[in-house]
Amino acid sequence: MHKFRYSLHQHYSKRNSSDKSKDSPISQNSNEENDSTKLSSSSLQDLHDDLDDIYNNYTLAQGTNNNSVDTLDSENNQAINKFIDKPPAIHGMEPQLPVMHVSSRLSSLGNTTNETGESIAKSAPGTPLSSHSFDFRPHHPRAVTNSSLNVLLDTPNVSSEFNHLVDQTPPNESVERFDDSNNTVDNTEEEENNDDTDEIPKSETLKQNEENWEKKGAAVKTIKTMDGEMKTIRRNVTDFKFGKELGEGSYSTVILATDKITGKQYAVKVLDKRHIIKEKKVKYVNIEKHALNRLSNRLGVISLYFTFQDKDSLYFVLDYASNGELLTLIKRYNTLNEECTRHFGAQILDAIKYMHDNGVIHRDLKPENILLDDKMRIQITDFGTARLLEKKNDESEEYPVDVRAKSFVGTAEYVSPELLENKYCGKPGDVWAFGCIIYQMIAGKPPFKATNEYLTFQKITKLQFAFSAGFPTIIRDLIKKILVLQPSRRATIPEIQKHYFFQSVDFKDFDSIWLSDPPEIGPYKMTAKSMMKVPELNKAPITTVIKKNVKKSTNSNSNTNNVATAVGGSSSNGHKGSSPTPEKEPSPATINNKSTEKVSAASVAAYVLNKPATNQNSSTSEDSSKRSSNSNETRKLSYSQQDYIPGTNILRPQISTRPSVGSYVKTTPSKDRKTLTKVPSNIHQQQEKVKPKVMEVKPATTLEAAWEPYLTHPDERILRIGPVIAHKEPTEPFEKKNKASLHISPLDINKEQRSRSNTSLLTQIVNEVNNNTSELKKVENADESLAIIEPQYNMKRSPTSDSKKSMDIERSASTSGSRISKKAIFKKLGFSHLEKNDSEESNGPSLTEKPQTCTLVVTTHGRALLFIRNDIESNYLLIAEIKLKYPFIHFQELVISQTKFSKLVPSVGVFVISSIDNSLIFEVEKFEVNQWTEALAKSKYNEIGKR
C-alpha cells in the first residue's frame, strides 16, 4: 500500500465546504487557498466524515482523471510529463485502483520539481536508474545500461512513470486505435508484442523523439559510384540487424551486425554514453575514433566504416574478423612454427610501420588486440589507448620518435621498460611489444610473466627472461636485438626487416606480404635447421680477419701469409697439423722496418712458434709446428664452444664474433730480435690479461679491523656486510620446485668484470675451469666440501645432505660410529631422550631445520662468511664459509618469494648461492638482492683474476 500523505489542516479548514468539493476540484482548490480558519475541536463523527470525504475525493471523482502517483494531491498540482502515455478517462466508468507491485527501492520515490517545473524521477544514488547521477541526462531516458556488461535494455528508468504504468492495461479503445493506425506491423511482431507482458507502452511524443534521434545521429557518407556520380549513404541503428555478442571491453560491447541493405557483416562496437561519462572515458573514445580515421582503408589495421548514435549509445561500425584473435590461435596450437611466425610477424611489422608513418603509436600491442580476418590476415584493433603524434612543424612530414607520457597505459606483460622507469612512450615501445609477440609465438607464453603485475614489472626492468630449450637460434638473435632496455639501442623497424629471419620477405612488395596464402599452421618443432647458427653472423667476421692477415703479411714474407691463414682457421693445413717451413729467415733490419705497421699478434706468435730452430733438424721443427697449431686450435675451441644456455646443454648463439687473442695485447714496435724470441712468455701475459681485472687494494678501515680475526690475508677487504635470513636446502629438489622462478643474477655486471670479449658469466666460469684443469678436471667430480665449509657441523650429520659426503668430513671413525649406532638403536626403541646430553651438544643453530637470522660478510678474496649470535652481547659464531672461486658455485635470484611474508610484504627478495648438493637461500629486502649478487660476483671474479 502506498503511504497517503494528506494535510489534516487543509481538510479541517474546509469542513464547511465539503459538499462543494465533491462536485468540483476547482472549488476545492479555492477553498484551500482562501480558508485560514484554525482547527477547532470536533467529534468522532466529524473525523469519520472527513475521512470519507478524502476517500471519495480520491476514488469516486466524476469527470476527472486523478493521476497521482505518490501523493493524494489533485491533478492540478502535478507537473505534466509529456512522455507518459495516459489513457483518457471514459465517462460513466468508475476507474479502478491499479494493482501495484512495489519494491523496496521504488516505494520510497517521490516527485520533485526542478527549475523548469518538470518532474524528475529519483532513485537510489549511484545506481544505473539514478538520473541525478549524470549531468547530461536530466529526464526521460529510454534505456538502462548495465555498467559492467554495457547491454542495452529496452526499459525506461524514470521510477515515477514506472509506478504509474506497470501492470496497468490501457482501455480496449485505445489499443484498437493504435492497431488501426499501424497497419504496417507484421502479424508475427504483434504476437511477440502480445506475448511480452512486461513491455511498457510509449507515448507518441517519446516515439517521435526517438525518430528524431535516429535522423539526427545517423551516419552520412558520400561515395563516388562507378558511373562517376556522387551517392550519399545514410546509416543508423535501424539499418542493422544485431546478432551475437563477439566480445566486450572496459567500456564497450562488440556485437555482430548485418547490414539490412547490403547483407554485409560488421562488428559494431556499442558504447554507452552514460558509462563513458561516468567512468571518464570520453578521451579514449575520441582517440580511438581519430586514430581509426587516420588509419582506415588499409590492410593490417581494422577499418572504421560508420559512426552514428542514438539517445543512449554510440556505434562504431568496424571490420568483422571472422577468425578471432591471434591469442586464440596460439593457445589452440600452444606454439606456432617458424613459417607461421615469419608470415604473421611480417604482417604485424608492416602494420606497425604504417601506423608510425601516420603518427599513431598503439601502446597496447598484444595478441588479444591482433585479429585474423577470413583470409587469415592480421588486423590490429583497439586504439583506445593510442597516442596521436603531431608533426614537428607545418612543413615537416615527419612525426617525433617519442613523447612524454602523462598516464600509464598498456598490458603488464608487453609494456616497455622506458614507460615504467622514465614515463616515455614512443615508437620503440611498439617495437618492444612486437618482440614479445614473436617470442610468444614460438614459446607459447610471453617472455615476462609473473604471478602479479609488480613482479612482472620487476622482470621487465631487470630484463629477466630466458629462452626455452630448443628455441630457434635465428629468432633468439632477433629477440635479443629487440628486447633491449635502452630504446636508442633497440632494433628499429628497418633493422628488423633486414634481419636474417626476414631475409625471404620482400617488404617493398605489398602483395607478397598481404595477398599471399598463409603457410600451414602448426606447432613449433625443434629441428637441426632451427638450431643452426646465423650464417651471416658467422661468415662475415671470419672473412675480414683472414683478409687482414693476408694483406699485412704479404709485404714481409709469403711464408708468414701461410702461417697466418693456418692460425685464422681457414686453411686445411692447420687441421692436419703441418705447416710449411720458411725458406729464409728474415733479418732483424727487415723486421724493424716492418714493425711500424700494425701486425697481428696472432700471426707473429704463429710465425715464432713455427720458426725452424738453427741447431735442430727439420723433423724437430715439424713436430714443434704441429704442437703449436694444435694448441692454437684447442685454445680457440675452448673459447668458442663453452658458451651454453643456462639450464641446458645447448650452446648460446654467437651474436658477435670473438676477436683473436692478439687483440687483447697492445702491439708495440720491436727494436731488436730478442723481443720476438720471447713471444712464448708474452702468450702467458696475454692469458693473464684476458682474466678479469683485479680490484685495487684500498686502505683498511675500522670495518676490517673489527673482523680481522676472520680475514686470512692483509689485503683482504670487506665488500659488503649485512643481516640476512638464511637456510639450506638440497639443490636438486629446490631447483625443480622453483624451476621457472630462478634466474641468474646479477644481469648487469660491469664490463670490467666481463672483460673476456663481452662473454657471459657462464662462459667465463667454463673458461676458468679449462684454465685450472690441474685442480678440477671435471665439475661433476668436484667436492662441495671444499667450497662450503661448516666448522660447527663437521661432527654432525645433515638430514638433507647425501650420507656419504657429509659423514666422512673430519670424523673419527670409532667415536662417530658408536655414537650414531647408539642413537639409531635408542631411536628405534623410542628412548632417544636418554642421549639428552649428546643431543644438546650437537643441537646448535641449524640452517637445515629452520631459517636463521645471520650476518653475511663478502670479502674481496672470493669468500662469503656467515655468522650467527644468540643475542647482542654474545660473540659472533662462524657457521659457514663459502669459497666463491669454484666453478660450481653460482648465484641466482628467486623472483617469486616463498616466505610467509610474500603476501603481506611484497618487498622481500630472495637470492641463492647454489652448489652441487646444497643451496643456501638468503632473504633480504627486495632492493638489496641485486646489490648482494653484484658483491658476490665481484668477489668471485676478483679472486679468479688474481690466479
UniProtKB/Swiss-Prot annotation:
Predominant location: nucleus
Feature: compositional bias, Basic residues: 1-14
E.C. code: 2.7.11.1
Deletion phenotype: Sensitive to cell wall-damaging agents SDS and Congo red.
Keyword NAD assigned: no
Biological-process GO terms, alphabetical: endocytosis; filamentous growth; intracellular signal transduction
Keywords: ATP-binding, Cytoplasm, Endocytosis, Kinase, Nucleotide-binding, Nucleus, Serine/threonine-protein kinase, Transferase
Gene Ontology molecular function terms on file: ATP binding; protein serine kinase activity; protein serine/threonine kinase activity
Bias-annotated ranges (Acidic residues): 187-198
Function: Serine/threonine-protein kinase which is part sphingolipid-mediated signaling pathway that is required for the internalization step of endocytosis by regulating eisosome assembly and organization, and modulating the organization of the plasma membrane. Phosphorylates and activates PKC1. Activates YPK1 and YPK2, 2 components of signaling cascade required for maintenance of cell wall integrity. Required for stress-induced P-body assembly and regulates global mRNA decay at the deadenylation step.
Protein name listed in UniProt: Serine/threonine-protein kinase PKH2
